[in-house]
């Protein structure tokens, strides 16, 4: 993915997050709480790093363009909402009834967010960005994400 566009990189991450949700569902069905907790911790770190790198690359560019600003602001607010859910989940007994209910809400909101990005925001932004800009933003995202993963793991 050396020359992948920002949208390719973000979609790849979204697909990995969907796979983590599927693995968590499998672990829950198997009543494997230890595996579920590991997968959830992995999801938290991944999603936190993804959001930060996305905001530093694509969203920063979109916020600087009047015709894209509103969509970027909306997505930033959704990132904050997911972050708030993750904080609330940290305060609940892992895999308890309240935790499972809050997790289901967070999952629904997150899946809505990435679907909205892929189906609405990315196509709109792609019309405004050149192929060179998309590639440059993809490289910036790829550069920022490892640092953000490290930071997210340290916070966890």
Q: In which residue ranges do the predicted regions lie?
A:
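Small-residue-biased structural context
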Residues: 1-156
